[in-house]
Every structure is written in C-alpha cells, then in structure tokens.
Amino acid sequence: MLIIRRHLCFSVSLIFMFLALPVEVSNALEDTKRNSTLITNVIIYDGSGDNPFKGSIEYSGELIVEVYRQEVESNGYQTIIDGEGLALAPGFIDTHSHHDLGIDEQPMAVAAVTQGITTIVRAVDGFSDSPPSKTSSSSRNDYFSIKEFKRYFSDIPVAINMASFSAHNSIRFRVMGDDFRRVSTNEEIEMMKRLVIEDMEEGAYGLSTGLEYDPGIHSSSEEVIRLTKAIAESVSYTHLTLPTNREV
C-alpha cells in the first residue's frame, strides 16, 4: 500500500507540475517581451542567400530572440519599431576598407555604421598605415605590425570589428628603408618572411600586396612568391588598379 501511495503521490505531483508549466512558460515569455524590442513590417535579408521576406524581429540587448515570418501580436513589448518600407540585414563586411585611418580619434566610425558596415578588413593595398595620433601624420613608411595594431587598439573601444592583412609594402619599407628601388636580396626576403609570419601568428587574415605602388612595384616575382608560399594556407590578396605589362 505504501508503494502505491508513493506512486499516487508522484503521479499527482506530475499532474500539478504539468498544469503549472504552461503558466510558468507564459510568464517567462511575457517577461522576455517586456524587456525586448520588436521590429515589425520589415523586409528581412537573413544572410543565407535566400530571397528576402517580410516579417518581424524581436531582440533584447545584443541578442536576437526570434525571427518571425508571420504577423506577430505586438502588445506587451518594451519598444515597437515599425519597419515599413525598410530593410533589415546582418552587418555588412567591408573587405577593402580604409575606415581604420583616424578611427582611433573617431571610434564611433559613423561613416561605416551608417552604411550598415559592422566589420572592416584593413591593411589592404599592401599598406598597414599607422594611425594619425600615433605619428605626426598617417605614414605608409611606418610599418604597423599586427601585434602593434592589437596593442594600440586594446584600450580604444571602437564601434566596428576590424580584421587585418599583413601588408607587403609596409614590410618592405621596414626591411629596405629608403633603398627600396631595387630587387631585394635573399637576406631581405627572409627578413620580410619573418615579419609576415609574425603577423600571421598574431592573427592576420593573409597577405596584401599593391604591386603598382612604391615600394612593391620594385619587388621581383620571386619575392612575392616566396612571401605567399610562407603563408600558403592563408589568403593572399592583391590590389590591381591599372592595366600593365607586368606578369600577374
């Protein structure tokens, strides 16, 4: 009889628990709504490549709570934004950006974020420019390594994400100085390789070149090939602007 009573008590407890569950879930959802913002009637590009659709998005703080493809009851939300006539998408990635120049002095990056850009890739064209406040003026001759870049911006909270290349031209300046209007020696190429590899170990996305600018225009094919081979498993990016007779 005792065993039966235990089963009976357990069964009754389960019944009460499941009866109470919808109420608790409902209360939790209401709490979420009270702390959330709902954007309604907006064209949504979800980043998957699928066709856009009209729907609503609920978010709280920095988190997207739910994406709705159907009409949503808007009562109870902390804030409601009518997105009629507007489009909503994940942040854009600017894969060739110069927004980093001056961003230490204007960390809100208004020119980028007002275009929907949330991530930039810097140190393109083979140059890793030093920020203006680090030198008297932005200098392409002053190589700004990835380690220096990370250290410099560690105490400067900026409004966008920044990825970076290792920059061939700036590295060539570092190694060869003003004597860059010639083919590099084997020793100089090895020094460049070490700097590129150090950048990669610090988180560089790949190697960028600008072979139509000083000093890269004076580099040999061997120099470029050896540097790219040193980081063969990463990305190599070259900026081509004008047609030339030079081999690519």
Question: Residue locations for each model-derived region?
Answer:
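Histidine-rich, glycine-flanked metal-binding segment
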Residues: 29-35, 44, 48-91
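Bacterial N-terminal signal peptides that target proteins for export
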Residues: 2-12
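Bacterial N-terminal signal peptides
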Residues: 11-20
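Divalent-metal coordination cores built from histidine and acidic residues
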Residues: 86-87, 92-93, 97, 105-207, ...
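Bacterial Sec-dependent signal peptides at the C-terminal "C-region" and cleavage site
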Residues: 19-32
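Divalent metal-binding pocket/active-site signature
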Residues: 201-240
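Single conserved hydrophobic/aromatic residue that forms the stacking wall/gate
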Residues: 239, 244-248
